[in-house]
Amino acid sequence: MPKPRTSTGEKNLISKRIIKLREKHNMSQRLLAYQLQLNGYDMDKNVITRIETNKRYVTDVELKALSEIFHVSYDYLIDGKEDEI
């Protein structure tokens, strides 16, 4: 059974917002991965790259981790409709 995708065929809903947040915070993919690792999440630069290029699905744990790092809600990451916290 195929995994679900967005209406445009993407594997995740958050790639554009992750790029936007990372750039807003002047973070490279490597620095974001490092910050995630410091917070106990096993994500490396390659994971960030694959998420940002829609080549990888995002788990609930990863969504939580990214929400914590950027201090935004899950709703913002998924829908982009809610203001950042």
Name the predicted role of every residue range.
Residues 19, 23, 37-38, 53, ...:
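Residue-level detection of the helix-turn-helix DNA-binding "recognition helix"
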Residues 2-9, 68, 75-85:
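Short, charged recognition helix plus adjacent turn
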Residues 26-50:
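Short alpha-helical DNA-recognition segment
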Residues 14, 25, 41, 56-59:
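Flexible coil/turn residues that form the inter-helical turn or adjacent wing/linker of helix-turn-helix
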Residues 46, 53-68, 84:
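Short, basic-rich loop-to-helix N-cap that marks the start of a DNA-contacting helix
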Residues 32, 62-70, 77-78:
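Hydrophobic micro-packing sites on short alpha-helices
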Residues 17, 28, 59-62, 73:
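Residues that mark the N-terminal boundary/hinge immediately upstream of a DNA-recognition element
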Residues 1-25:
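A short, Lys/Arg-rich alpha-helix, primarily the initiator
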